[in-house]
Amino acid sequence: MADEKFSNFLTDIIDADLAEGKVDVVHTRFPPEPNGYLHIGSAKAIFINYTIAKHYGGLFNLRFDDTNPAREGDEYVQSILQDLKWLGAEPNGGIFYGSDYFERCYEYAEQLIKEGKAYVDDLTREEMQEYRGNDAGKPSRPSPYRDRTPEENLDLFRRMRAGEFADGEKTLRARIDLASPNMNMRDPTIYRIKHVEHHRQGDKWCIYPMYDFAHPIQDAIEGITFSLCSLEFENHRPLYEWVITNLFGKEFPKQREFARLNVTNTVMSKRYLRELVEKNIVDGWDDPRMPTLSGLRRRGYTPTSIFTFVKEAGISKADNLVDMRQLEAVLRAELELNAQRRVAVLEPVKLIIDNYPADQCEYFDLPNNPNRDANDTTTRKVAFTKELWIENSDFFEVPPPKFKRLTLGSEVRLMGAYLVRCTGVDKDENGKVVAIHAEADLETRNGNPADGRKVRGTIHWVSCAHCLDAEVELYDKLFTEANMNSIPDDADFKDYLNPDSVKVLQGAKLEESLKDAKPGDRFQFVRNGYFTPDSKHEGVYNRIVTLKDSFKL
């Protein structure tokens, strides 16, 4: 039985079926089509199917729904495998390919033909739409080819397989109910002709089963008991059940639907995401601004944060829009505890300590993680020299109100080091400050002044002689519109792209201990946010999330 920590309407259904002895094993599957990269919405489907199977001690399959050869490819297969491995969603039931069942699907199609439950149709796609009517009250009418004999249909279907006909010249349709209010039941197409090479089967096939026909067959063959999918397939459930009943004569697999995960300021449509990639609007499917799992991974998100976010967003029957800041808040809480601290000056200006020896270098011990809950008391040594880099924004000649950092004549603490007082500045011919001069109170090493005077603030720094150069990329939301599902149907989604979705900072200065950092490492750059080395470009750091946000969990 589902415990209170993981209980929802889906587990209620499963609990009832288990209690009544209808099933012995809970067996689920995640069936992505390998025609694009998985995204944060896919993570919800993975989470539900994987977690439910694990919760009941059952089985979880990964099945590639590769029944449409037009856009499918091994690149997407490999990315999906990598994503599931990264998420830790091990398919303990096995990894399968829908294309491996093509022969079985074909045999089941012939069975329906022989039983008079399927027929070969010559109507074009446009003609078929006209004949089927619509769900607004326009009645359907039978195709002129609906009453072909099983023998004629079987002959034509076998000739379709043999490649005698062109794409679209003929289809195989299930004979169900032309008067059904559900359009999916009005003699749906279950096979079409496509003279396209398949990424696994090559040119062996030129007819391919439709998803609504292949999917229930694949579920039944694999022993799936609960086919859990997103809400857009709810109207397809009667067809799913028709296939299961007519070919297998049993109640299970059972299809049930849950609401999709929609997130603010992004799009989930593979068509839209592919357009962004193909038009070079983004840096590939794994661009850190993309909602793809590979993009989130490159950005620095963790598998734990994604699954926690999905769980907190909830499992319901009603579509909802979840604020992206909720995911950021989940990750921020994790990184606050786990990320080691490092110093990085993103927009540097030079600070010269005039009373510090030019040939001297000393090291200060700075904590790796001062968070009390982290139980990390380790430190690292950071070099201190006469010339330092500080943030340009930490100095003002004419400070704004309540400014507590460095100004002419004021005193601040250099984090973990000395108190310094600004004595002057150097400017270029345009009047821009290029260097700041200060004097250090050398009696305040790692401590407070003996006279107890108050300092205005604390700023971070790195040594000019002991630092790394880096490029830093600060990411923001990809789209300006929060709910991209609400834009007008005739609108171009690209018109809503955020022109400020990334800010690139050249010439950032990082403490030298980061020389061994690698992609997948995550750091808090003190006072600047959480960052990770980019996995594509050496010497580039991506901001994962800011230090703070007004959003509260």
Model-derived regions: residue spans:
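N-terminal catalytic cores of NTP/NDP-binding nucleotidyl/phosphoryl-transfer enzymes
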Residues: F6-D15, A19-Q82, E197-S230
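Intrinsically disordered or highly flexible coil/loop and linker segments, enriched in small
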Residues: V23, A118, A166, M183, ...
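Secondary-structure transition/capping motifs at alpha-helix termini
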Residues: A19-K22, T51-L59, K85-N92, A220, ...
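A glycine-rich helix N-cap at a beta->alpha junction
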Residues: Y76-E103, Y108-A109, G116-Y119
